[in-house]
């Protein structure tokens, strides 16, 4: 890229300190969330729709009022600062360009508002347009641009002010697959070249894994896991994180710990079982939990076809798909499969949802206001978390197996994760 734009950002670290947001109607969107983003870091907020990631971004920008907690920019508490005082620029999902202004005028506009003369603002806009590969469309109106070009213009208009923090709210979600890939690569390269602190919101795991220095995975207004892309994929903190990252989704299998007379640990999966090596660190942990119900996480590539492996599962192929570089088999093994979207959410069967649990921010807020507890939610239907389903297995591309074929699957136990019934790792590795 031609770096004619004299970009010298005033970088800053961001700290979110126990930040919460409660909307009218007592909807708790963000629940006492704490997160640190370093100077110049590219942090991705990843999670399903409605998890609070966009609300969090808007609180950082000053577009949503923080109900509790603090937002820090370096050593400055920015919680009560107006948006224009925060040194933050934000790109929205739709771009939100001025329709009656040309591309160059859109990019120049923040500089003109700041009092810069038209000649200098135009020169700066032209330099940034070269970085964004839109110099050929500077005189065109937004309605004549492609979706990718409009998003480039929106990015240029945000960056031209040299913000301390750059916020992007699902900027690629309205683009086709080819354009998403192209612009994703450009955003990653550009933000690192410009060395600006960046927060990027998405529900797309591919965007998160390819762009981020670190990923914060969110669910229900809280952070489930934070780490590098490699860490959150290979060493997930919860079953939800393991299930949210990866295609095909990880197999989450309901199991019961069984300790033999010789202190060997087996994991019973219905009428089948697998054993852990006695030297495996997880054996030492599970040895004291005989009879405990756990969840075994195994990605599709942890399985292989076998005839004589010591740890194997037997099943029948229900479906077989060719994916170009690999084949995917759906094998019925008669094992209960856990839904990662529900695990950790169901109320304990022995208590009401509010019992034996640390009060949340919302309940404490109600208490201080002198309000009673809201009525408990309806109980989860029986079997909502566990269900009978197929084990998904990745096989070599040249494998040809017919539906109904009986197969034996070796499971590499060194590649499995073990979670408790709340979805948290039993064998958690401290980062």
Q: Model segments located where?
A:
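The feature captures the beta-strand-to-loop junction immediately N-terminal to the Walker
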Residues: 46-48
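ABC ATPase nucleotide-binding domain
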Residues: 15, 36, 72, 408-410
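ABC ATPase nucleotide-binding domains
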Residues: 81-245
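Helix-to-loop junction immediately C-terminal to a conserved catalytic motif
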Residues: 61
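Conserved ABC transporter NBD signature motif
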Residues: 68-77
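Non-catalytic connector elements of ABC transporters
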Residues: 260-431
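Short coil-to-beta microelement around the adenine-binding A-loop and adjacent beta1/P-loop entry
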Residues: 26-28
